[in-house]
Amino acid sequence: MNLTPREKDKLLIAMAAMVARRRLERGVKLNHPEAIALVSDFVVEGARDGRTVAELMEAGAYVITREQVMDGVAEMIRDIQVEATFPDGTKLVTVHEPIR
């Protein structure tokens, strides 16, 4: 299987998000990369489902809470930017203050 660098990045994010979900199910707090991956995956999948950029910018800020991440992680992540494929093309989605 020949994948483009973009496709490899998408797969890596999806896999990291799966790991993050499993850890949350076990009650383990997420680290920085896991938190980024979980929010990013939410945005990518939401775009595929037909949600709008505005909806994802708002909803992306409520995917995980401060209680679900390790100390200091929420302060480290001010914005998350994700290129997502929507029905009408690829767009950049920015989630401000993604961990509240």
UniProtKB/Swiss-Prot annotation:
Q: What are the subcellular locations of this protein?
A: Cytoplasm
The Enzyme Commission number assigned here is 3.5.1.5
Question: Which GO terms fall under biological process for this protein?
Answer: urea catabolic process
Which cellular component terms (GO) are annotated to the entry? cytoplasm
The record's annotation in CDD domains points to: Urease_gamma
Which reaction(s) does the protein catalyse, per the Swiss-Prot or TrEMBL entry? urea + 2 H2O + H(+) = hydrogencarbonate + 2 NH4(+)
In terms of one coarse class, where is the protein primarily found?
A: cytoplasm
Q: Which pairs of Cys residues are joined through disulfide bonds in the record? A: none
Pathway per its UniProt entry is:
Nitrogen metabolism; urea degradation; CO(2) and NH(3) from urea (urease route): step 1/1
Enumerate the SUPFAM superfamilies for this protein.
Urease, gamma-subunit
Keyword flag Cytoplasm: yes
Instruction: Say which family it is in.
Output: Belongs to the urease gamma subunit family.
What the protein does comes down to: Disrupting the ure1 operon causes loss of urease activity, decreased resistance to low pH killing in vitro and decreased pathogen survival when inoculated in BALB/c mice by gavage.
Family matches, as PANTHER family: UREASE
Q: What is this protein called?
A: Urease subunit gamma 1
Species of provenance: Brucella suis biovar 1 (strain 1330)
Q: What is the lineage of its organism?
A: Bacteria, Pseudomonadati, Pseudomonadota, Alphaproteobacteria, Hyphomicrobiales
